[in-house]
Amino acid sequence: MFQVQKELASHEAVVVALFEEEKTSSFVQELDKAFEGQLQVLLEEKELSTKKKAISKVHSLGKTDVKRYYFVGLGKKESYTTETLRSALGKTFKTLQAAKVQDAAILLDSFVTEKLDAIDVAHIAAEVQGLGTYELQTYKSDKKDRVKLEKFTAITAEDAQEIEAALTVGYVHGRATNSARTLVNMPPNVLTATKLAEYAVELAEKYDMDYKVLEKEEMEELGMGALLAVNQGSVEPPKMIALIYKGKEEWTDVIGFVGKGITYDTGGYSLKPREGMVGMKGDMGGAAAVLGAMEIIGELRPEQNVIAVIPSTDNVVSGTAFKPDDVITSMSGKTIEVLNTDAEGRLALADGITYAKKLGANYLIDVATLTGGVIVALGNHTTGAMTNNEELFEQVLEASMETDESIWQLPIFDRDKERVRNSKFADLNNSPGREGHAVMAGTFIGEFAEDTPWVHLDIAGTSESSGAHDLGPAGATGAMVRTLATLVERFGEE
């Protein structure tokens, strides 16, 4: 699909950058020779806009071998960022898709500044091409296939091999994020814990990873009472899924991802209202993020050891379901008083984290659609983070900044630990109350990380979008897929 060339050839569409202070850039001047000065007139008349994310279409009318030019406004260079570029190109690729363009090119060097080099631009362009044109996988009987971009050429004076490599990495990042989106959007009667495990196994086999899928009997032998408690009410068997990627000869320095895999959450006996239950098919967004990251890792093969653990079940009501006031024993041996069956994700993660440590994880990053509290605190565009290790958090933060996936650190104080340890009947309670809800959930999970360096990522607000946006349609976003993969890539380079 991707090509790199030094000269512009015949294309249906060519994408060109426009900065506010460079209306007469060398790229525009060169094109304007064929247009006999008409582009400059359009700029002066403001029919070609330099405003951020403005897209101006100009037909060549046979003056060049290119049918149409799409000029992308990027605003002032001083405020130009990777986020600006991602949004602008996302909107551009949506526009190209709507116009049924199959062969497009980008004047890559027109997007290059002192802040962003050609490799950065190539990576982002290939990544965003996939993200911006992602389509929901529906179950409608009258599906209509859209015309898709078949050929995309980067026009640049830079080294072709380096640009091709950047295009490949960007494409893989975008494709894997879309894989995660598709998982999150799937209905719960289709994506059960069993089906999620089958997907994970297929992924592992494709990329020659080791894997384990623990069945209920094996979980009982290992004492995974927290995950098993959540599963008690279900007719669907639980799964503890583990993917093992060996990027080094020695099994050391292992990053452990733990993704919440609750395939549907009714709240259990602490039942959600209808409004709160619809959409809970997406409560396995953490699992999807982890699997998306493992797809990238499998494709790009970084020199880093990684484990991905996914505790998976649904949380439903029945005569056998667990109840408020139950006391359960986790795999770690710690006992938990259940005060809220709708705080089930942290129970599943407790056993998931303990299992990841058993498999050799030296660093832990858990990802979960965990609390409504994080949405109240940070909204729908920022993932909440908590940690017991500032050095590891800084590495996660740097990866998130590189991918433009915003995260914000929430605190853990001793008084928070006291609240989750406040139980007359057990070592911990799973829901100390509404106050500081997001912090309480993260603090509870930290009790199982113990001294292992750990970062918690609550994607309840960022896992899905209520409306269409520059990087995709309404629905799942694939939050944290690219951040997790970038973290591993950076670890592997050290």
Swiss-Prot record:
Keywords: Aminopeptidase, Cytoplasm, Hydrolase, Manganese, Metal-binding, Protease. InterPro entries: Leucine_aapep/pepB (IPR011356), Macro_dom-like (IPR043472), Peptidase_M17_C (IPR000819), Peptidase_M17_leu_NH2_pept (IPR023042), Peptidase_M17_N (IPR008283). CDD domains: Peptidase_M17. Binds 2 manganese ions per subunit. Pfam families: Peptidase_M17, Peptidase_M17_N. Its cofactor is Mn(2+). Mn(2+) 2 binds at K260, D265, D283, E344. It catalyses: Release of an N-terminal amino acid, Xaa-|-Yaa-, in which Xaa is preferably Leu, but may be other amino acids including Pro although not Arg or Lys, and Yaa may be Pro. Amino acid amides and methyl esters are also readily hydrolyzed, but rates on arylamides are exceedingly low; Release of an N-terminal amino acid, preferentially leucine, but not glutamic or aspartic acids. It is found in: Cytoplasm. The active site is at K272, R346. Its EC number is 3.4.11.1, 3.4.11.10. GO terms for biological process: proteolysis. GO terms for cellular component: cytoplasm. The keyword Transmembrane does not apply. Its main location: cytoplasm. Mn(2+) 1 binds at D265, D342, E344. GO terms for molecular function: manganese ion binding; metalloaminopeptidase activity. PANTHER family: CYTOSOL AMINOPEPTIDASE, LEUCINE AMINOPEPTIDASE-RELATED. Belongs to the peptidase M17 family. Presumably involved in the processing and regular turnover of intracellular proteins. Catalyzes the removal of unsubstituted N-terminal amino acids from various peptides. This is Probable cytosol aminopeptidase. It comes from Bacillus thuringiensis (strain Al Hakam). The gene is pepA.
